[in-house]
Amino acid sequence: MDDDDAKLKAEIEAELDKLSISSLEKEDIESDAKSETQSDDSDTDSVELPESVLHCINIIKNRSKAVEELILQDLEDTDILSCSYGAVSNNHMHLRTGLSTEYEESSEQLIKILSEIEKEEFMRSKTDCATPDFVPEPSPHDLPMDEHVLPDDADINFGYCEVEEKCRQSFEAWQEKQKELEDKEKQTLKAQRDREEKQFQEEEEKRHCWMKQFKVEKKKLENIQKQEQDKMNDELYKEEKIWKEKFKQHEEYIRNLHLQMEEERTRFKDQQEKEKNSLLKQQNNAAVKIQAKYKAFVAYQKYGPIIKEQIESKKRKAQEWKEKEAKIRQKEEENRKRLEEEQRIKEERKKQKEEERKRREKEYEEKKNIVKQEREQLISKEKIILREDASQQLIISSALKKSGYNNKHLSLEDISNDKGDIAKNLVDENSKKQEDVLLWLVEESNMKENVDRQTILKESIQVKLKESISSQTILADFKMEEKNENLAKKRCSEELVKQERKYENTDNKTELGNSDLKGNLKEQFPLQELKSDAQKEEKIMKHVINENTGQKTQIILGHNQEISEVKTNEEQKIIKDNQQKKIQKVEKEEIQEQNGLLYKDKDTLVISVKQRSLSLTSENSKDVRENVILQEKEIYSKSKEIEENPKDNAWNSGIVIFNTTDTMINIEGKRNDQDYVLGRHAPCEGLSNYNAESSMVSKEVNSLKSEIRNISEKCHENAPEPDSMTCCVSESTLLYSIEERRLAWIKSFKPWLEIFKQNQQKKIVRRKRPVKCPANMTPALDKLEILRCGPWDTLQQVTTVTFQDLPGCVLSTLAECTNLQFLSLRRCGLTSLHSLSNCKKLKYIDAQENHIEAIECENLENLCVVLLNKNQLTSLHGLDGCTNIQCLELSYNKITRIGYSFFLEEKLVDNAGFCHHLGTSTSYLSLAQVWIPTGLCWSWIPITSLTKNSDCNFLISHLYWNCGLESLKNLQQLILDHNQLINTKGLCDTPTIVYLDCSHNHLTDVEGVENCGLLQILKLQGNYLSELPSLENLVLLRELHLDDNSISTVEAFSSYWLPLLQNITISQNSLTKIVPLFHFVSLEKLDVSHNCLSDLKSAIKWFDACYSLHELSLTGNPLLQETNWRDSLLKVLPALRILNGNILNSNSESRTEEHNQLGSAGFLALCQSQIREFNLLIENYITGKGDVFTLDTAENLCHYFKKLMILSTEYRHAHERGDVTITKKDESEAQKNHLAPTNSDSTLQNGVFYSCAREGEPDSPDIPEKWMDSVSSHSPLSKSATCENMEGRHQEILVCQKREDSKASSIPTIRIPFKEVVMTNSLLRNHQNIEPSEKIMAAVVIQSYWRGYLMRRQTHFSTRLHTAATEGLPNSSIKNQTILKKGKRENIVNIRKQREKAAILIQAVWKGFILRKKLTTALEAIKNEESDEEYREIDLEDFIFDEAALEEEWLALDSTRFPSQTLLLSNQLHWPKIPGNLKWDDTSFNLPSNPAQAWLCNDKENLSSSEHTQFNSRSENKTSSWTPESKTSRKSLLKSEKEKKISEEWGFKDISTAQQMLKRAQKMKSKKLKKKIDSTVRLALFKNNENKVSLPKSPKMVQPRRDGYFEGIEEDPIHKDTTANEKLERNREYTYQWLHTQVGVHETTSSRNMKCNHFLPELDPDVLNGGRVQLVARLVSREDTDLDLFSMTNGSALSVNREKKNQAHRHSAGSSSKLWFPSKLI
């Protein structure tokens, strides 16, 4: 500041010195200064002048005053007035000299002023001299003034007036000039003042800026000082901490030393004791040996002769035994000879029987021919009679009316002729029908023979071991068979004779009518005769087949048949007798109907007959149910044969299956339930009308003969294609395998009731254990605090105790609370649970978040819920006698095992034979082998110190196993997560457990779960499991959690039957494949994320037929790199709604409903109802309040567990029995209302459709309202819409679906309408492996009869309705249905197309947005490329490449199996594929991405990636040209084996990439190694490499261009004529040039200025000089740019992908690279 002031002062003084101011100017300045001071007061107030300026101003003012005074003095001087003009000049000179002496400071200025005055005067004088005549007259103003001045002086000389006038004039002129000068000077002064003010302001501003900068710097310095101070403080604090830690460590070290000293002392003492004991043992052993030897010597002397006698007796016995064996062998040989003779006799008898059978067949054929001849004769007689009648009519009409009635006669002749033609046509049709019926009968007989053969084969296998049948019984049986055959023949002949007589009588009766009636009867009667003849032949065929079944089976069976004839013949006789009786009844009924129903329609007659036959078969269901399994297997095998040979066997198999209606009646339930091949599909494409008519087979029955005729004619016309069979057969085989699994499980399961009874009957041995007593320092619970919690006066009245956050307490005061029911002590510092033995009514204990180490809660029988989470427990002991515990939570403890712990109750037996009780012990020294009754095995049991240290013999009398859970007989929920479990063997003592959580432990295997038959939820995530737990007996399992384990295979799933399993999570494991999951019929959620699943084709097989799967997670698996993985999975899984966390908009509800109806729908309904009941139970009882528990909630929880136990046991028994029926209140009411429930969904839909058809009728008692409510509750629609929806579904499934599926089927079949009989047989089939009681069997049979009666009544009613409805418009409803269906299909297709278009547009917009976003981020990153991030330099020695080692150890893989089908190891991660190499569809909006590379890339080579060219901006300046000729030459470079291997291994399309890899690997060797190699060796390697790349020369084609470093070889035209030496020299030059031009810019270093069109991409010289190599794309990561790897349907895809990078996977393989990347890139 002082320097600035001094500078200002100096400048002001310099400016003031330059100024020259006169006295007048000073006056003006003063006047102006006054005015300016008044106007500039505001300025002066704001800006104060410095002192120096003020001082100068004052000096100027003083000088101006002095000048004025001097001037006035001169004017007043008298001498001057009297003197002349010259005197004045003298005075002036004098004044000048005077002033100069007085005022030396401003003398120069005064001299200047005076000189100017003189000049003016001189000029005036000149003017006066020039005009001497002119005398200025005094003005009138002057004269009076002069007069006035000098009035009295008359003598005064007035010469001064002139002078005065002149002076005045000169003064005025001077004044004017001075004014002008003053104005100019003022202007200059003003401008100068303005400039100075501006400079002053600028300097002030600079000063203020300097001040601000000073303050800022001051603050910075202060902040730096503070930071340094903070750092110093932190360092001091850290040093203090370090010193404290070191001090603590030192203290701990000292403690450890003390402990080690103590341990060494104890060890020394123990060693001394052991030495003493060893000495004692040696002495004892020596004594024992001596005693043993002495005792052995005494015993040998005493018992030697006895032993010798025993040895001799043994030898004698052995010899006797040998003699007996020889006798036995002789007897066996005799028996063998006798059996051979018997077999020879039997063979002779068989031959005789064969001859008899052939003879009978001949007789049968002869009889058949006779019957045909008789029938032909009857037909010929009828024709003759018809012709005679017609001729008689003509004769009579011509005789009576010859003339007048000619026209009428002609008309009658035409009518008669027409009748004759109609009769002929009917006869021809009947003959055709008869032939068809014969074919049908033959096939049916063959089918029955096969069935009988299989039944006899089965029975013969069972009776093979019975060899005690005598020959007499066999002969008697043969005689009885012959008699039965003869009787059957006689009966057949008699029946034929009777029927012929009846037909003759009917003919005679019909001839008595009118002529018109006779014609009608003769037209209709042959039809009836043909029907009756066909039925007769059918009966005859049945008789003959039944007679010959035994003979045919004897040919097949051979020797075993004779052994088993007794049993088989008895059963066959019973079956034959029953069949004959029933056939006779049917024949009688048919004859009566033929006599009484001649004028009825032919369809109704066959319907009645068929209904009666089916009713008879339903009554005979008990006799035939044993053959059901064989029939099922036979049909299944036939379906397979048809699948293999569809063209050859289509017609034959169709007839066989069609004609086995009688044998298939017992299996129809299963076929209808599973939508099996039989009865599900139509025969061929052209049977649309027939399919429509037979679509409602369950309510309609058509004529048998018409159906056979239609099938036979139309199937010959339209033969189906063989490839169309695969779909239906695959579905059928799938459903058959599911049912097979269910039946196999029913055979092999462990009955849960037996396990439960064994557990209940197991004796619990209680022993006293040492219990840790609480410390005396902790206080007991205060009685007053307990009583304040409720309205209680004494502790005996207390029922609930709740405390939280107590410092520490003991529960001794609770011993007086005898009525305590609810105890909650959270965070109360408890160390043990004790003193509760008197609280017998205690139900609920909540002691979470304490420090409990021991439990003492024995004999609390009412205890239900125990919550001990977050404590310090190490075992499960202390709950003995608490038999009613239902929920036990022990998470976050230190429990190590649920396994068995043993304790021995030992007794010693001394030498005298006395027994001494030693007590129990758990410490052991050695082992002894003991039989364990619980495990049914021998095991090594420890011997304790009590027995080991004794000198006597020992005896383990009782061995007790204890696991801590054996007394918990009703435990249902056990939670043991976050413990230290290594063993779970004790779970076998808890068969009632329903919920088990053992997650986050150290388990390698889960044992004891086999007995937990009611287990529904199993959580095992976070363990070390390598295999699946054994789940064979867990049929009720609903959730299985196996996340974060080491499971590598799930093949055990294929052997498990888990029909209720809904949720499976196996994420974060090492799975490379899964088994097919179709048999998990209720599976809804599957999580297999973060595994090693890579094969999409096998994944499609795994998920095939999982129709209930709604949610699937596959994130983190390599198969997501496939292009079409999403579409292929959605095709296989129609019901999928959530895929990898994204909600799908699927239009597959109709498909899922159809698939839900597939299979054993009754069983599916059972599973769904059970799951629904479990969920409803949870909703009703679990309030969802979280951790808030009260006494009411505890009681509610106990009720929930009781209900859960009842439901679980009931459903378990249902699965074990194989019962498929759903028992509900609504269904019981439905049974009362005469509508019994069936097994399948189709019957329910039939009922709903039937009810909807009868909506208009007011009285419909067959369908109750509650049943309709139950049906509508299962569907998401309202009750009013159920009828329409179910009707549409029913029509689509039963009417239209058959037409569509007829293309995929070549087996013409017909369904049997009686489905309730089927249900009874399916129930019997499910019970085949269980032996039910007599009451259950009786109930089942009664129900079957009752339901059969109901269904027969309903079918009669439905047939009436159907006939009434189909007479008028037979095909109108069917056409309407087909039209409606086509319209629906078109609408669905249009809607799907619109939705697909909309989805494509949305995806395109979304992907464009994401791409733009990524490009902006990439461009920003390019701008900020030069960041402060430091990369570690790469050691290029890591890239050393050994070609020989690569050739030796290279794995030659099949290119077809790479990369999707080759399975990696479990510890390897799958690298993401480059989408540019994959085949992607035009429909997929995917952008290919290229990986970041260390070398510079070529722009034209990577045209497919526009982003890559932007990312690598450096490559634009240094890339080489790429010509199409080089592309064609690259395609022919496949000769090198190494390049082929690399291209096959890595999947490269272009061989150039493999060459680049090899050359780059060779070039990236370190310089040190290159220096070590000799130049000749390097030259040889170079030649070898050149020879590998060289191409064969073709004479016709131009030599292809080589893009390498040695292009000059091809360009040189003299290359062909050069010798070998010149070639070597040239190669050396090129190698020298290559070695020297590898590093650096080629344009500058190349000697020949060659073209740098290099074969490989160039390495950056900066990289070779030690610069940084960017091996990872730092702009956008590859996972983000690869749009194929994640779905764009959700906006959170990018965030999810970024979260994946930070997600830690426990089993993921770490990277082996040495590079370090900054945090921004990761």
Curated annotation (Swiss-Prot):
Compositionally biased intervals (Polar residues): 1506-1524
Disordered: region residues: 23-47, 182-202, 265-285, 319-367, 1506-1534
Biased composition (Basic and acidic residues): 265-278
This protein's name: Leucine-rich repeat- and IQ domain-containing protein 1
Domain named LRRCT: residues: 1117-1157
Gene3D superfamilies with a match to the protein in the record: 1.20.5.190, Ribonuclease Inhibitor
Residue ranges of every copy of the IQ domain listed in the record: 283-312, 1335-1364, 1395-1424
Residue ranges, compositional bias (Acidic residues): 38-47
Disulfide bonds: none
Listed GO CC annotations: microtubule cytoskeleton
Biological processes annotated in GO: regulation of signal transduction
Database matches in CDD domains: IQCD
Gene name in the database record: LRRIQ1
